[in-house]
């Protein structure tokens, strides 16, 4: 009998759509983490800065969850890449963050529907809920301006 190193059966390891979606999610979360650090520094009040830092902590958790899932499926470690530039202006940063969060919700929900991997479904669905909440905060701060 052959025992595999990977915790997932072969069909999950050979799911190129799931692997591609995880790679995109990992790079997106990594980019958001970088941009939200900058956005928090540009914040006009402590209250706003603290909320953006809380959102950033959620993104760090998402990155960890997606990276762990990717590693357990592929047996490989992924080095995330920043795929988006961070605006230098607070209002433009809020606008970019709001749009990115909304697009990410759609992407994560679609990724959850496209896979039969129950762990991945759960991770993508929970992250989508968080991203929608983040979008609401960014929209709120945009409307304050």
Swiss-Prot record:
Spans traversing the lipid bilayer: none
Disulfide bridge partners, by residue number: none
A Gene Ontology molecular function term of the record: metal ion binding
One Pfam entry name: Rubrerythrin
Superkingdom field: Bacteria
Protein name: Uncharacterized protein YhjR
Source organism (scientific name): Bacillus subtilis (strain 168)
Gene this chain is encoded by: yhjR
